[in-house]
Amino acid sequence: MTLAYSKIKVEPREVELKNKPQEMFLASPKGTVPVLILENGRVIDESIEIMIWALTQSDPDGWLSVGQKDKCHELIHLNDIKFKPILDNYKYPQKSEKKDPLYYREKAQEYLYKLNSLLMKNHFLLGNHINMADVALFPFIRQFYMVDPQWFAQSGYKYLHAWLQFFLDSELFLTVMKKR
């Protein structure tokens, strides 16, 4: 989404994760997606770093707000360290230790509550306009939602649900998804 927002032209390539192309490993030995290869040959292979790079190229609405930098990075770090492992187990309980998606949904409650509480005060996570944290966390909340949309819609996270719906209905998201 950030690349599209910043109007960065890219050549997307679908990668079958079970059969990664050799070119991908040549560009980034980590073998993980995403990988962005710039015209000058520089490789950026971390989502957040790609977002920051794109926003330093063009950020018409101030998503990379300097005043919110520490809070933004704190939320993203919390998502990556705490929520992402829970999300993976919730989405794929058969691969998890507990094998019970409800167990992992319960484990996610503290994080979801924190985000919902932030959204009770503002339209977006860190204020009343979109910030990089919103766009970075949106895909993860969307994945969580997709496991059981009915539960999510009926949960007590009405502010988080409204925030998610805002992004799901956004022209930017719909345009990016249409290109796939």
Label each residue range with its predicted role.
Residues 1-110, 116, 123:
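GST-like domain detector, emphasizing the conserved glutathione-binding G-site
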Residues 20, 68-71, 104, 128-137, ...:
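Short, conserved alpha-helical segments within structured domains
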Residues 57-61, 147, 170:
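Phosphate/oxyanion-binding loops and surfaces in catalytic or ligand/nucleic-acid-binding neighborhoods
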Residues 78, 114, 139, 143, ...:
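Alpha-helical scaffold segments in carbohydrate-active enzymes
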Residues 117-128, 172-177:
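Surface-exposed helix-capping loop/turn segments at secondary-structure junctions
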Residues 125-150, 167:
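GST superfamily/GST-like fold recognition
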Residues 150-158:
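Catalytic and substrate-binding regions of cell-wall glycan-acting enzymes that process beta-1,4-linked
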Residues 158-180:
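Long hydrophobic alpha-helical segments typical of transmembrane helices together
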